[in-house]
């Protein structure tokens, strides 16, 4: 069972940030990328835009299981906050793609000139470090319902 207080803090953090590190892999081939994202807390999902011909996208099309981080850049140890996540990503199409694109372009207006596809990263597991709550404080969330 997810702790409601942890969920509130995790959601607030994901709403406040906008860049994630995404790690994809298949077999011995792995690659990471930094991407802008929009958080959908109702679905516990992140929407991101990236071309299909990139190395990380080609890997995601083979293996949709991904992992990554969302972190602040604090120079003060007591203020460090960050998330490690595991999820499943899929390329959007049709109405779902258009809805995600509209939402993404509202957050990042410069994206209106891009035709790059939108992806939905369904979060499966999150561990958040929040030193503002005490050094090394960890918050956890995991998806309880199947996708």
Curated annotation (Swiss-Prot):
Entries under InterPro entries matching the protein: Split_barrel_FMN-bd, UPF0306
Family, similarity comment: Belongs to the UPF0306 family.
Organism (species): Yersinia pestis
Matching SUPFAM superfamilies: FMN-binding split barrel
Name of the protein in its database record: UPF0306 protein YPO3467/y0717/YP_0616
Gene3D superfamilies named in the record: Electron Transport, Fmn-binding Protein, Chain A (2.30.110.10)
